[in-house]
Amino acid sequence: MAGRGFEEVRATFTTCLPKQHRDFLEALTVSAVIGDYFFCHAGVRPGVTLDRQRRDDLLNIREPFLSSEAEHGKLVVHGHTPAVAPELRPNRIGIDTAAFATGRLTCLVLEKDQQHFLPESYWTGQ
């Protein structure tokens, strides 16, 4: 697809994707609340309640979310912004360790009010 514009690629993909698959993807939610945790792809807009977050922010935000120390009502678990290691902050947990480029996938374990990460050796046996 070299030399093709994004819109052309998107149109081709949309045409080739079966309607059943497209309907499934369009029906997915962009966030979830489980207990004291709020899960989303990118993060939230500080100062906006979780139930009023915009789809675009949930999928694309970086700043001011990443530098914010504000409480969000729940502990936000997110990806979208790669880091060398998982980030555990009082108001958020960043789990994007660039698996697409590094091969290191982060596994966050949430047990009651405790959070920890499984070490790579858990998966590799090393």
Show where each model-derived region lies.
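Acidic, His/Gly-enriched loop-helix segments that form or flank divalent-metal centers
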Residues: 1-94, 98-104, 110-125
